[in-house]
Amino acid sequence: MSASAAPPNKLPADFLWGFATASFQIEGATDVDGRGKSIWDDFSKIPGKTLDGKNGDVATDSYNRWREDVDLLVQYGVKSYRFSISWSRIIPLGGRNDPVNEAGIKFYSDLIDALLERGIVPFVTLYHWDLPQALHDRYLGWLNKDEIVQDYVRYAGVCFERFGDRVKHWLTMNEPWCISILGYGRGVFAPGRSSDRMRSPEGDSSTEPWIVGHSVILAHAYAVKLYREQFKANRGGQIGITLNGDWAMPYDDSPQNIEAAQHALDVAIGWFADPIYLGQYPAYMKEMLGDRLPEFTPEELAVVKGSSDFYGMNTYTTNLCKAGGEDEFQGNVEYTFTRPDGTQLGTAAHCSWLQDYAPGFRDLLNYLYKRYRKPIYVTENGFAVKDENSKPLEEALKDDDRVHYYQGVTDSLLAAVKEDGVDVRGYFGWSLLDNFEWADGYITRFGVTYVDYDTQKRYPKDSGKFLSQWFPAHIAESPKPAAETKKAATPSPLKPHGAISNGVSKKSSATKEPKSASRKKGRKAPFARFTAYISAFLGL
């Protein structure tokens, strides 16, 4: 059903909604069942790298509690779940000639089967920042284009081969801007490289982020090439990339600030979106960086352009933009939340970079659709309530500021689709669970479900209840065959403030192992052809 065919004030019947997570933020079990280290394992244990000094060794223990998390998704009534695969759980040493870890394959295969059995569509991210440590040690990871592209494409091919019979929605990368700028520019994310010698013993913030971004684009594009040439014809499905970027509003009506807002969008979004969808880097980035911005060969550009079936949009806030900034990572634009009259743009979140401003969400949807002309999936969007981590449980569950945020965003989403004609096909709230929030440790909470990190009990917040009611009320119904209706999972009513602890849903927690047919889907397959094929189409 198209958006235009849906009833008034309804999203189309095939609209996907759900929640998102990332492997390192929730799984824990970092040294279990053959998993290799990622760059975040040791980095998060370096004193001062996380606000609370904690790491991801346990996180929300979802490697062991994934059935409980699936129960929670069913209780919320979601149609889809976006999660990421840990590269070093699949290929512990990461490389194209390194062995595949069958225990890692089985873990994700079982999760995918369980989701499908409960009527939930898996929406899978291949890379959410957890590069195998071995690849960083061998050749500095994303800084070595020739090596990393081959290794990433082989990893992607393994996932397509082993899971592609069941996964029909793929994301190659999560937020390349963060990979590049926060990991190799500011040095606050793994691997923590920066020109600031107080922060990092090595790195060059003036060159490395742009090299890394270039490598990420090429790895994405060649993985998509592999998918389209080797898998799409037989298995169908969609593949794309998810890019972060917040709406940029001019601070006032002055020409220089209007131009500054566009420059902010060029660097935050256009850096990656323009080559992928339009076939070239933004002119402003070329002007700003000169020869520090790598160039694509004609052969590479032919692979890069058009290498995403849709636009994966991660967004959280809106920035007011002034000309005259000195931060290249922001396009030499100054960001502020303070209007000319001294008022704030919106309610402040716990993190300083986020305020609630729903109109900007609608503006960004319109901008992306008009500029890139691709269907949009909102792959991440959420809010961190101020000081939520220090609140008593009952108070934390009444997350009014997060509810207000989602009320505004969902209203803007509906208006963008129904009034503006934007083709939005899905929405994923961030996040299903409170979790390891990277450099913030566990202090900043984005979940619609409260996690007691001492007991690992899960407690739905009011925001989760709101979304679980809003989307069913605003998605058009589609008739289903009687047989299919019988198979569909019926979500239990979601009660606010109810604890979901390990084993509380005994029927599901005691779920037997997947049937032999399901196990066969995760069985070992030949991979030698991937290496030969990858080398051939990369010209290496």
Curated annotation (Swiss-Prot):
Keyword Hydrolase: yes
Pfam families, sorted: Glyco_hydro_1
E.C. number: 3.2.1.21
Enzyme class, spelled out: hydrolase
Residues binding substrate, per UniProt: Q25, H128, N174, Y316, W430, E437, W438
Coiled coil ranges: none
Reaction(s) catalysed by this chain's protein: Hydrolysis of terminal, non-reducing beta-D-glucosyl residues with release of beta-D-glucose
Biased composition (Low complexity): 481-492
Protein name in UniProt: Beta-glucosidase 1B
Native source species: Phanerodontia chrysosporium (White-rot fungus)
Gene this protein is translated from: BGL1B
